[in-house]
Amino acid sequence: MDHLLLKTQTQTEQVMNVTNPNSIYIKGRLYFKGYKKIELHCFVDTGASLCIASKFVIPEEHWVNAERPIMVKIADGSSITISKVCKDIDLIIAGEIFRIPTVYQQESGIDFIIGNNFCQLYEPFIQFTDRVIFTKNKSYPVHIAKLTRAVRVGTEGFLESMKKRSKTQQPEPVNISTNKIENPLEEIAILSEGRRLSEEKLFITQQRMQKIEELLEKVCSENPLDPNKTKQWMKASIKLSDPSKAIKVKPMKYSPMDREEFDKQIKELLDLKVIKPSKSPHMAPAFLVNNEAEKRRGKKRMVVNYKAMNKATVGDAYNLPNKDELLTLIRGKKIFSSFDCKSGFWQVLLDQESRPLTAFTCPQGHYEWNVVPFGLKQAPSIFQRHMDEAFRVFRKFCCVYVDDILVFSNNEEDHLLHVAMILQKCNQHGIILSKKKAQLFKKKINFLGLEIDEGTHKPQGHILEHINKFPDTLEDKKQLQRFLGILTYASDYIPKLAQIRKPLQAKLKENVPWRWTKEDTLYMQKVKKNLQGFPPLHHPLPEEKLIIETDASDDYWGGMLKAIKINEGTNTELICRYASGSFKAAEKNYHSNDKETLAVINTIKKFSIYLTPVHFLIRTDNTHFKSFVNLNYKGDSKLGRNIRWQAWLSHYSFDVEHIKGTDNHFADFLSREFNKVNS
């Protein structure tokens, strides 16, 4: 039995002419062949499971007998039968067509009741003080102003009066609201903002912020499987390449202190129901790590060594987003909010067949995961797929990288709506967020390891901390690889990085025995000394003209992306990115002109996401490149490389500006930066 609170016809006359002033009424419009447009005040009732309309607002020929009459409960506790329905009716709201599959006929004293089935069909449904919002076709929001006064037009004779060429006078509308709600626009000074706001606008803003807090509270928990909030819609499966194999790795030895810590953590995991005792033939050892992050939070982290299992299972090829692509989405945005999924992977349930593959050993015994554990190679792709499925429709103002969600907007007004829509979607899917990691309405925010601030970006402070904490004397190749990995992570912010890395990179060759000399220690000290801070780089806006400047030497190439910012008639060139690399062995034998051309090509490849499909400027001190672009090669096999390069460059739109070597400040800058390290 569908549950729907309605008034009886008798009650309608007695009660429904007065409604609660906080009721939600919006304007709606119906069109029927042979009739004038029918404008209605629709009541949005999320407590009603169905859409209900009066027989006096929809022509009789559009009503049909229901295949199965339904029973509904009304306000006095009794039940009535509804047997008439209207199929696939189009309700026009705020100029948008909303198709309703089924509308039921019942006299409630209101012309049209929009029930919860409509709200779910066009979710997320968001209510603010002055408006409601539906998402049309789940792709863009439709703002609908609330009415401060509502009337009923559907009475005897109304439809006759609405027929085209009808001379019947339309009946007088019946008021169904207590009174018109009026809020005088008395302005008050907001000194901290340096501007003036009306009391009404201030009240509305406060109400919206309160709504955001309420929505955030609904989706936050310390338990990633909170039974009151999760919908358990994210599921995953893992398969062995050879199902007949048992993957076993021998257990580890544990100190008394570690045994005590394991005892606490295993109990916590059992209480959360993310693990359970296992009889699996598979086995991987668990161990504890206590790195900087763990020391900051005061708790060691349990890790399972799934290296053998990862080799034995089928991978997931779903791509993680390209970080540069994500950053292009936020160009020019002024206000940000970010959210972190609580223990993200643990929100994905494993099917029963996959759970034994996650079995691990620890001092307390043999356990397996009910959820996707950290350490499985498939975990990031599995989680990204689910998050993309949930948030793809909001790509214009939201991006997701695994378990990090960033919302970005041009102004606070838009941002209130955008954040509300994202939190509503989390609530709908049961995606649980960490409240302590939520950052709301920030002009400066951390995302993807970057500090984003007023159109600039740079690596977060902990990147420099990691670099400086490395010892000057490294113990082995693994430690050197970690150090070079951090430098590579920050490569966009370090000019001529390839040259800086080269002496250290040479030590990682397989045929070179490990040896760390006093000279290596001095070089390491100089590298760290010259990386005391990363410059904030400009995030180019779509309308700004872009420039690439390049340089090549015998062994290396370098490039820089710049943007021309126009401010009060003055052009300023701002640095956006650096790029560098080493020439391959064969390329080192190229003529210097070809190396300069290759430097241009490599730089364009590095910054292609910004250079497609815009028109940009290439600036170089190489006189050959400008003529090379316009040369007409005639298929000489010796010039095949040049023909290929010309064809590749033809896909881009650019001008070439030659500058004198003495004016090439970029090349001077690169040389100066490199010489600092080598001096």
UniProtKB/Swiss-Prot annotation:
Gene3D superfamilies: 3.30.70.270, Acid Proteases (2.40.70.10), HIV Type 1 Reverse Transcriptase, subunit A, domain 1 (3.10.10.10). GO terms for biological process: proteolysis. PROSITE patterns: RT_POL (PS50878). InterPro entries: DNA/RNA_pol_sf, Pept_A3A, Peptidase_aspartic_dom_sf, Rev_trsase/Diguanyl_cyclase, RT_dom, RT_RNaseH, Viral_Replic_Matur_Polypro. Its EC number is 3.4.23.-, 2.7.7.49. The keyword Transferase applies. One of its GO terms (molecular function) is endonuclease activity. The keyword Repeat does not apply. Residues 40-130 are annotated as: Protease. It catalyses: DNA(n) + a 2'-deoxyribonucleoside 5'-triphosphate = DNA(n+1) + diphosphate. The active site is at 45. Belongs to the caulimoviridae enzymatic polyprotein family. This is Enzymatic polyprotein. It comes from Cauliflower mosaic virus (strain Strasbourg) (CaMV).
